[in-house]
């Protein structure tokens, strides 16, 4: 057992994201499985569509963080560029982060 997160494969690490106001949190496994959603009580006064959009935006960021880390692992192992071209990139992650930052 190690305390070094880099020693754990990206697919097995946990990634989390939250809204700027910290009212919605989502935790995702690097493989993409959602591990948890946390909603702070004040967010429950918002319309359901806003809450759903916040959950989706958080899940997207957490998922993409894991996928970008996984892609980096593949690149380090010498995977050919065309073999991982379908995987999300840092640019995809930044677009998701920008969308999340735009939420209230």
Indicate residue ranges for each PLM-predicted region.
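Short, acidic, Ser/Thr-enriched surface-loop or helix-capping motifs
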Residues: 29
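Acidic, negatively charged sequence signal
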Residues: 1-25, 33-38, 42-104
């Amino acid at each position: 057992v190690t305390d070094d997160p880099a020693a754990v494969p990206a697919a097995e690490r946990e990634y989390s994201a939250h809204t700027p106001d910290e009212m919605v949190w989502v935790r995702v496994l690097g493989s993409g499985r959602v591990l948890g959603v946390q909603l702070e009580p004040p967010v429950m006064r918002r319309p359901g569509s806003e809450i759903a959009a916040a959950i989706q935006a958080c899940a997207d960021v957490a998922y993409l963080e894991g996928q970008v880390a996984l892609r980096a692992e593949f690149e380090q192992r010498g995977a050919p560029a065309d073999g991982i071209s379908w995987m999300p990139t840092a640019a995809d992650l930044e677009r998701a982060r920008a969308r999340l930052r735009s939420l209230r």
